Amino acid sequence: MTDTTIRLTQTVKGAGCAAKLAPGDLDRALCGLDLPVDPNLLVGLERADDAGVYRISDDLALVQTIDFFPPMVDDPYSFGQIAAANALSDIYAMGGVPKTAMNVVAFPAKTMDISVLRSVIEGGLDKMREAGVVLVGGHTVEDSELKYGLSVTGFIHPDRILTKKNLQTGDCLILTKPLGTGIVSTAIKAGLAGSDLTERVIRNMTALNRDAALVMGDFTVHACTDITGFGFLGHLAEMVVDSGCGVRIIAADVPHYPEALEWADMGLIPGGAYNNRDFRGMFVDFGAAVSRRFRDLLFDPQTSGGLLIAVAPNEAEQLVAALKATGIECAAVVGEVVEEPLERIVVE
């Protein structure tokens, strides 16, 4: 079996970020842990943020994250690129600059040709090279399924950290990539997605969030996260709860893959979407006009999704224009931060 014949999605049970442990299970596993206290740990496990931040000096802090998962596309090289872009995204979401990375690999050596792993690593390495990141090592284990990702370290100024918990009333929320990758990945696995859509989704998933992060650095951004395995509403709920505010989302303005809605109608929805809804659905109020399939889309676990940026309202149009000017064509204002209802997401 070689990398020219294998369909990676047929070799795994889960796909991409949809393979994450259910958020409720993770919450129970972490609840009540006696975490070490360190005054230089600026962002840690006490909040569900995108990366940890540790202060080295008054003007330098380390940003650290790790992300890996099974393949959501069939091509090994593309999978490597997507996994690397997804892992690097956490650093960008915090406002940091990624510097070094280490490979995390699980590989079924008895059933898969080693050329597959070579292609995966080459894809990841090329994406790291594009990001200006140095690969310094890695770790492998033999497993029944292929998994790949990165542990990433970046730099940030301690006073310029972006977290999920600083939403301000009136902020506009901007999304930089379309939703629906979890549903589309399920369709790819089922052999239903055509080549044009598959190529378009791969292009978006391999796109670094670097350009969006660079652009938002010139604006008054109060909070940011990247949309990944807990879905749009799952990650937004974390922001709302941590910030002590509410959010209003306009469903018609949310960028998405139209094909994902068609497959949602067919029930082609990853299990992670149901886990996300079960855990965070209590924070969401849907208007009567929001269809069931669109509700499913908003809980769909994303792989290498876009940034969700909270920006001062008087700068929102300029930020969207600047994002589009860099090639992020789907960037759009999808909602606003409101004072009430407290800790609620209203989708209209």
UniProtKB/Swiss-Prot annotation:
Entry binding sites for ATP: K20, R47, A48, D49, D67, D90, G138, H139, T140
Organism field: Pelobacter propionicus (strain DSM 2379 / NBRC 103807 / OttBd1)
A Gene Ontology molecular function term of the record: magnesium ion binding
Reaction it catalyzes: hydrogenselenide + ATP + H2O = selenophosphate + AMP + phosphate + 2 H(+)
Cofactor: Mg(2+)
Protein name stated in the entry: Selenide, water dikinase
InterPro entries: PurM-like_C_dom, PurM-like_C_sf, PurM-like_N, PurM-like_N_sf, SelD_I, SPS/SelD
Keyword tags: ATP-binding, Kinase, Magnesium, Metal-binding, Nucleotide-binding, Selenium, Transferase
Residues the record marks as site: Important for catalytic activity: K20
Gene3D superfamilies: PurM-like C-terminal domain (3.90.650.10), PurM-like, N-terminal domain (3.30.1330.10)
Similarity annotation: Belongs to the selenophosphate synthase 1 family. Class I subfamily.
